[in-house]
């Protein structure tokens, strides 16, 4: 089993605050820094990835649009969506970018299987799908051999804002969520399973779940 990860449960936090913290953490870390996983939800926000095109923002309305340096196109975050950010030293864990993407996709597939939901990844588009419908989006950034950003799993949320964009740059892509397929399932049910499956696939362990670290996130 590889070295232990720090797990942080951040609750509901503005996207820009957490993005700032990820950058600050990654810029400050050394080869001795522990890897971290952050579990968080965001207030409603559209985020444009590095490859994002304005044409895929159809009618954002009053929902803010934030530029992100993660990979990919536009997506939507909102309460009831479990976001998991993975801040990993890829060299130390002997992971390539493709293998990390595969690990995250496998994490979602295994998590959903625990709720009797059959899901799959696609070779032509990152993420996890139920049939033709997308349930989880992925977007990563690598800096100094370390990853940040991560995945967003739709659990029990308002999906209607996805109709205001071409999700991940695909016109007409339908989104689905865990609670539509396993009624009554919420974030509190999914989050511990998601974390456990990720740690299992990484062959990693974790200590007690922590909250904000003011050194990186502010108070």
UniProtKB/Swiss-Prot annotation:
Domain BPL/LPL catalytic residue range list: 31-206
Record localization: Cytoplasm
Binding positions (substrate): 70-77, 137-139, 150-152
Species assigned in the record: Sodalis glossinidius (strain morsitans)
Family the entry assigns: Belongs to the LipB family.
Molecular-function annotations in GO: lipoyl(octanoyl) transferase activity
Miscellaneous information on this protein: In the reaction, the free carboxyl group of octanoic acid is attached via an amide linkage to the epsilon-amino group of a specific lysine residue of lipoyl domains of lipoate-dependent enzymes.
Keyword match Transmembrane helix: no
Major localization listed first in the record, in broad terms: cytoplasm
Database matches in CDD domains: LipB
HAMAP family, A to Z: LipB
Enzyme Commission number, as recorded: 2.3.1.181
Annotated site residues (Lowers pKa of active site Cys) in this chain: 134
Name of the featured protein: Octanoyltransferase
């Amino acid at each position: 089993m590889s070295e232990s990860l720090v797990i942080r449960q951040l609750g509901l936090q503005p996207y820009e605050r957490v993005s700032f913290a990820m950058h600050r953490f990654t810029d400050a870390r050394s080869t001795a820094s522990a890897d971290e996983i952050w579990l968080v939800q965001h207030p409603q926000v559209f985020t444009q990835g590095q490859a994002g095109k304005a044409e895929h923002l159809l009618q954002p309305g009053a929902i803010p649009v934030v530029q992100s340096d993660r990979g990919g196109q536009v997506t939507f975050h909102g309460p009831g969506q479990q976001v998991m950010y993975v801040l990993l030293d890829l060299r130390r864990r002997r992971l390539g970018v493709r293998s990390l993407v595969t690990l995250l996709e496998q994490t979602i597939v295994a998590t959903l299987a625990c709720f009797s939901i059959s899901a799959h990844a696609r070779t032509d588009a990152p993420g996890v799908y139920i049939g033709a419908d997308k349930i989880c989006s992925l977007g990563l950034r690598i800096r100094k051999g370390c990853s940040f950003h991560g995945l967003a799993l739709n659990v029990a949320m308002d999906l209607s804002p996805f109709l205001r964009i071409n999700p991940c740059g695909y016109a007409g892509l339908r989104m689905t969520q865990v609670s539509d397929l396993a009624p009554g399932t919420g974030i509190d049910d999914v989050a511990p399973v998601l974390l456990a499956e990720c740690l299992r696939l990484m062959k990693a362990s974790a200590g007690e779940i922590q909250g904000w670290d003011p050194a990186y996130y502010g108070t």
